[in-house]
């Protein structure tokens, strides 16, 4: 298809049309009294949501020009969603309005360079004004208020999120998952940890809408080595495939033949697998892998110092967890094995002794980071309801409220 160049009044008209579509579809969801929107799906029931980002992504005008303009606005919402996790409705409305007003000014004969400079100056003025208004959110009541507003005025959601923040701390790990029960919202505190490493290939993703890897009851293979070839882990891959359970590989790196074979197995459906890099560097990586091994009940962290080889590992020697959640940036392990609590506490006590005996401020800081990850645990918000549509709508609001709360307490 040949490219079409559009300028002048035709372009301005298309911009106005897209802005009006966004105002009608997205603008109505804004604020604590915002309305919900039903999004038609090619299969299954429609999705009911108040999430501006989901609404924006669903807007696909048939006109190619209108679609291109809508995609530009959606990109700004996407960046806002990635960086903050909330505020996408406000971001989209502002972006659409800026584009509309710039189009009007240009049509009236204003110089486009002057318009751009004016927009940038206005942005700085607005940011300065907002920074002067900000204040810290400290109390549990204030946290609940922030979450309640973002959850469309649902006080129960606000109170539960504030409870989670108080339990695991403002830097603690809080996740949201669907419950099989009818109870609208429940909180469960469990062992677990999160580290700053994401999946090594987007092909590992199991939830394409949110670009997540989500595993239930997975096996976990830990190694300090770099995996370049598939041969050393073939026996364990075959055993895991026969078990029907997913596998998470945490290694120094996974690349080349090893990575491509894992991706191929995942795409063919032969094995639910994902791979991430181990957190930390050098000796700190060794220590953090040891922490993960204690938490998950893994008997070995495969390394050059260990007599046992990867080919000889059995399923009983691998780690396990209740759930694994992996984004492009983070890995969250939720729920330790049943008999690991005593071992985790022993590890925590060991780290505390190391902190007291260390003379290096840097080492103390890193030890405290490990202590926080291991002892903080994970708070799980379980969302239930009487129907799938109800659960998904409530889960969207809980996730939005959680993102808003995190942004407020940072």
Curated annotation (Swiss-Prot):
Which Pfam families does the annotation name? Cpn60_TCP1
Q: Where is the signal peptide?
A: none
Under the heading Gene3D superfamilies, the entry gives: GroEL (3.50.7.10), GroEL-like equatorial domain (1.10.560.10), TCP-1-like chaperonin intermediate domain (3.30.260.10)
The EC number(s) attached to this protein equal 5.6.1.7
Q: Which GO terms label this protein's molecular function in UniProt?
A: ATP binding; ATP-dependent protein folding chaperone; isomerase activity
Residues at which ATP binds: 29-32, 50, 86-90
One GO CC annotation, please?
Answer: cytoplasm
GO biological process: what's one of them?
A: protein refolding
Alphabetically list the UniProt keywords. Answer: ATP-binding, Chaperone, Cytoplasm, Isomerase, Nucleotide-binding
Q: Which reaction does it catalyse?
A: ATP + H2O + a folded polypeptide = ADP + phosphate + an unfolded polypeptide
Cellular compartments annotated: Cytoplasm
Give the main location: cytoplasm
Q: What class of enzyme is it?
A: isomerase
- Note whether Zinc occurs among the keywords: no
In terms of NCBIfam families, this protein maps to: PRK00013.1, PRK12849.1, PRK12850.1, PRK12851.1
Q: Could you tell me what this protein does?
A: Together with its co-chaperonin GroES, plays an essential role in assisting protein folding. The GroEL-GroES system forms a nano-cage that allows encapsulation of the non-native substrate proteins and provides a physical environment optimized to promote and accelerate protein folding.
Assembly, in brief, is:
Forms a cylinder of 14 subunits composed of two heptameric rings stacked back-to-back. Interacts with the co-chaperonin GroES.
Give the family, as the similarity comment puts it: Belongs to the chaperonin (HSP60) family.
Cite the PANTHER family for this sequence. 60 KDA HEAT SHOCK PROTEIN, MITOCHONDRIAL
Q: Specify the protein name.
A: Chaperonin GroEL
Organism the protein comes from: Ehrlichia canis
